[in-house]
Amino acid sequence: MNKINIGCGWRNFGDDWIHIDGGDYEHLDYNDIADLSQFEDNSMELIYASHVIEYFDREQVVPLLAEWKRVLKPYGVLRLAVPNFPVLAGLYLQKKISLEQILGPLYGKMPMAHKTIYHKTTYDFDSLKKLLGSLDFCNVRHYDWRNTEHSQFDDHSQAYIPHMDKENGT
């Protein structure tokens, strides 16, 4: 299976994955998540990007996702994880968490090489589905990280509030 982990950071999913990230990590295969020109059209079965697209504004993300779609095989899988804005807002409005507890997931401070980047937008399921539909992605649905080929890797798709409380968190 041809699989890409885009925005993998320091997480190495193993030799059967292609690792792409803008950071400086020894296990990376490539450093530019927006340019996949090294891959042929329709060559990948799975692209996984956990907490990546929110670092691009609503205009920048369109060509980014179009490039990712180009390399996906027909019926290939694009698996995205993004901060869950409705859950974060709901927990805050219900006074179950403080403002300080949602700032990290909403604004996403990430040191990268010689700069620090922050989230530029947020999504709910409907806005993400609309965006993906505009690029002809189909069968857009939620997924459970426990039922994926990368479930053993602790990444932001498994982030819960309280932080990483997988038993009691939301």
Role assignments for model-derived ranges:
Residues N2, D15-D16, L78:
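A generic secondary-structure signal marking the coil-to-beta-strand transition
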Residues N2-G9:
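Conserved class I S-adenosyl-L-methionine
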Residues H51-Y55:
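Short catalytic micro-motifs in class I SAM-dependent methyltransferases
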